[in-house]
Regions:
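Glycine-rich phosphate-binding loop and adjoining beta1-alpha1-beta2 segment
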Residues: 60-105
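Glycine-rich phosphate/adenylate-binding loop
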Residues: 2-39, 43, 137-139, 143-275
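A structured beta-alpha segment of the ubiquitous adenosine-cofactor-binding alpha/beta core
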Residues: 87-128, 135-142
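Active-site catalytic pocket residues across diverse enzymes, especially alpha/beta-hydrolases
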Residues: 47-55, 81, 148-152
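Short helix-terminating capping/connector loops at secondary-structure junctions
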Residues: 55-61, 156-161
């Protein structure tokens, strides 16, 4: 009998049940979107569409704070969602203004990096329930992980408890999206599934690979043509749509068997990352 029970447990599908506070919240779910470049600008639009869909389903929706200290240059036009009239504006301000006008939201722009202040302290507006990083440097990912690890320690009973981190990353033709939990998310008892309460950070699970990739050239592109030599025209938008679909599935299904995916746009191959 014990052997049979063990076999049944091994055959169970691994799933992660979404924190119940995100499924039926009293207030909009707070999201810190870090990076307003090629991927971040596309993810912001997807979040705005998602917010509209959620509110139509009698959900409280989303409140997004976009972090980026970069300004719009000629090289950003075309590959990123910016117009000539927006040149020299902060990326975060231009994008948030556009979304707020179009969707009637009251989302906020931060014209600074998502980092600790000059005294090494966390900023008050860093707290949110979901973090989405669309950054182009390995150091930024490790800095974000350090901040989230500090926030993870403070798990009192208050609004905006940090719960999930979704990281987007890409090279010229390939990319990946990875969902992580910030600490353990309590799981219900299930006879059908093997529940997983902790999904490691990308810096923990793929830290060595990230450090190897850091050796590649990350100098800024001075033109769109130069930018396209480093990143394909549609890698950012493809990654953004698929990654946003992962987040949407958390809200619509309440659970997930996959925590992300690898994408190769050159051969149109994608591979899910199972729990």
């Amino acid at each position: 009998m014990n052997t049979e029970l063990t076999i049944n447990q091994e055959n169970k599908t691994k799933v992660h049940f979404v924190d119940s506070a995100l499924i039926n919240p009293t207030n909009p779910i707070t999201v810190n979107l870090i990076g307003a470049g090629g991927t971040g600008s596309q993810v912001l639009t997807a979040l705005a569409r998602m917010n509209h869909a959620l509110t139509e389903l009698n959900h409280a929706g989303l409140f997004v704070r976009l972090w980026d200290d970069d300004v719009i240059t000629e090289a950003n036009l075309g590959r990123q969602l910016f117009a000539e009239s927006e040149l020299e504006l902060y990326k975060s301000v231009a994008l948030i203004n556009r979304v707020n006008r179009f969707f009637g939201t009251n989302w906020k722009a931060e014209t600074q990096k998502f980092e600790k202040n000059g005294l090494g302290k966390l900023k008050s507006n860093m707290k949110s329930e979901i973090y989405i990083s669309c950054v182009d440097s390995v150091k930024s990912r490790f800095d974000i992980a350090e901040i989230l690890n500090e926030l993870k320690i403070d798990k009192g009973y208050y609004r905006n408890q940090c719960k999930y981190w979704i990281d987007f990353g890409n090279s010229q033709f390939t990319g990946q999206v990875l969902l992580s939990t910030i600490g353990n998310i309590k799981q219900p008892n299930s006879e059908k599934y093997e529940t997983v309460e902790n999904l490691p950070f990308i810096t923990e699970e793929f830290g060595e690979l990230l450090k190897i990739s850091e050796a590649e050239d990350n100098t800024p592109s001075c033109s769109l043509a130069e930018a396209l030599e480093k990143q394909d025209l549609f890698i950012n938008s493809s990654l953004a749509q698929m990654g946003s679909s992962l987040l949407w599935s958390l809200f619509s299904n309440g659970l997930t068997e996959n925590r992300g995916f690898f994408l190769n746009l050159k051969n149109f191959h994608s591979k899910p990352i199972n729990l």
